[in-house]
A protein has these predicted regions:
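Short beta-strand-centered segment that lines the nucleotide-binding/catalytic pocket of NTP-utilizing
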Residues: 27-40
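ATP-dependent small-molecule kinase phosphotransfer cores
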Residues: 37-108
């Protein structure tokens, strides 16, 4: 089983490419955002620490963390973002390591893909066999984020500034998929790469 990290800036199109991979290959996909939501739930390892740090004002009526409210608060404050990441990322990493161990023991899949914007910053280079960078030109990413997620320029700026630069991604990754154009073109790049392992 090959463990492959999938990373790239916000709006680069990681979700669409992972959906293609999920359908066409014998694999499991771990989304770090979903793992993060899991560890933030009431009763899970990060919940109490986050509520203590960000105050109960970030909670919904049912006691769950309001993700939108939390994101607005932390992306506006670099030191707060760093503190929150320091709480969530170790728990997510442990969750992912457990999943890798489980899939290795089951021996049922060819690939385990791990997707996250912050794989490199969080030290995942040492637990994946390869890191893939999903690239898309900044103007295309901005257009996608405005159309698909209705993000403002300010919100896009804040998120992009908190992520690695294109150059940093390229230096750290083993393989680059250019997802600036048609999806079919990106799918072909994936197929060519995956064929090297099958």
């Amino acid at each position: 089983m090959k463990v492959i990290g999938i990373t790239g800036g916000v709006g680069s199109g990681k979700t669409a490419l992972l959906e293609y991979i999920r359908i066409h290959y014998n694999c499991e996909i771990i989304l770090a955002d979903e793992a993060a939501h899991h560890v933030e739930e009431p009763g899970q390892e990060c919940y109490e620490e986050l509520v203590e740090l960000l105050t109960p004002a970030i909670l919904n009526e049912d006691g769950t963390i309001n993700k939108k409210r939390m994101a607005e608060e932390i992306f506006a404050d670099d030191s707060l973002l760093e503190t929150v990441n320091g709480i969530i990322h170790p728990a997510v990493r442990q969750y992912i390591l457990s999943e890798i161990e489980l899939q290795r023991s089951l021996q049922q899949i060819d690939f385990l893909f791990i997707e996250a914007a912050l794989l490199i910053e969080c030290g995942y280079l040492d637990i994946v066999d390869e890191m893939w960078y999903i690239y898309a030109a900044e103007e295309i990413r901005r257009k996608r984020l405005k159309e698909a997620r209705n993000y403002s320029d300010e919100k896009i700026d804040a998120i992009m500034q908190s992520q690695l630069s294109e150059d940093e991604y390229r230096k750290a990754c083993h393989f680059v998929i250019d997802n600036s154009g048609e999806l079919e073109n990106s799918f072909e790049q994936i197929d060519r790469k995956v064929r090297e392992y099958l």
